[in-house]
C-alpha cells in the first residue's frame, strides 16, 4: 500500500507543486486582492512586532529596503505569525480528491520565512516585495485500510514588482 500512496503523492506534487516563473500583470483591485500577498484578503499584512523574529532596514540609494525574518511556527492561523503576512496552507487546502484516499493529522511547520520589501525614497510607495517561506507538511494518508505518515517539504517564493 505505501507504493500506492507514494504514486498518489508524486501525482499530487506534479499537479500542485510547480515552478512558475511567468510574470503576470494585475490591474484591477480584485485581481490584486486575489494574489497579493495573502490571496482573498483585503489587507496586505497584519503583522505585529511579536510575529517578527528580526528586522533590518537598509539604504539602497533611491530606495529603502526592509527585511523581515520569521522563526518557526506550527499550523499558523487566525491572521497571526506567518498567517499575518503569508498565504499559508491549512488542512482544508491540502485535501486531494482521489477515490478512497483521505488525509488526516495535517501539520504545517513554517520556518525561516523572509519578506524583503523595497520602498521608493521619493514617493514612499512600495515598489518591490519578495516573499520566501518554507514549510514542512506532515499528514497521515488513509488508502484502502492502510495508514501511512507522509512528510514533504516545499518552499513558496513570490516576487512582486509594483507600478503606480
Features from the language model and the residues they span:
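Subset-of-secretome marker
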Residues: 1-164
Amino acid at each position: 500500500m505505501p507504493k500506492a500512496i507514494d504514486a498518489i503523492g508524486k501525482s499530487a506534487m506534479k499537479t500542485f507543486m510547480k515552478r512558475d516563473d511567468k510574470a503576470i500583470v494585475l490591474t484591477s483591485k480584485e485581481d490584486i486582492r486575489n494574489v497579493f500577498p495573502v490571496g482573498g484578503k483585503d489587507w496586505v499584512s497584519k503583522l505585529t512586532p511579536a510575529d517578527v523574529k528580526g528586522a533590518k532596514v537598509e539604504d539602497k540609494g533611491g530606495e529603502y529596503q526592509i527585511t523581515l525574518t520569521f522563526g518557526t511556527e506550527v499550523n499558523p492561523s487566525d491572521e497571526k505569525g506567518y498567517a499575518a503576512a503569508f498565504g499559508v496552507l491549512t488542512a482544508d487546502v491540502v485535501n486531494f480528491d482521489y477515490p478512497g484516499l483521505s488525509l488526516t493529522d495535517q501539520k504545517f511547520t513554517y520556518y525561516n520565512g523572509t519578506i524583503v520589501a523595497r520602498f521608493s525614497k521619493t514617493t514612499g510607495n512600495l515598489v518591490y516585495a519578495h516573499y520566501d517561506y518554507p514549510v514542512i507538511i506532515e499528514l497521515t494518508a488513509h488508502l484502502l485500510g492502510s495508514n501511512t505518515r507522509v512528510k514533504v517539504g516545499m518552499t513558496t517564493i513570490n516576487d512582486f514588482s509594483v507600478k503606480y
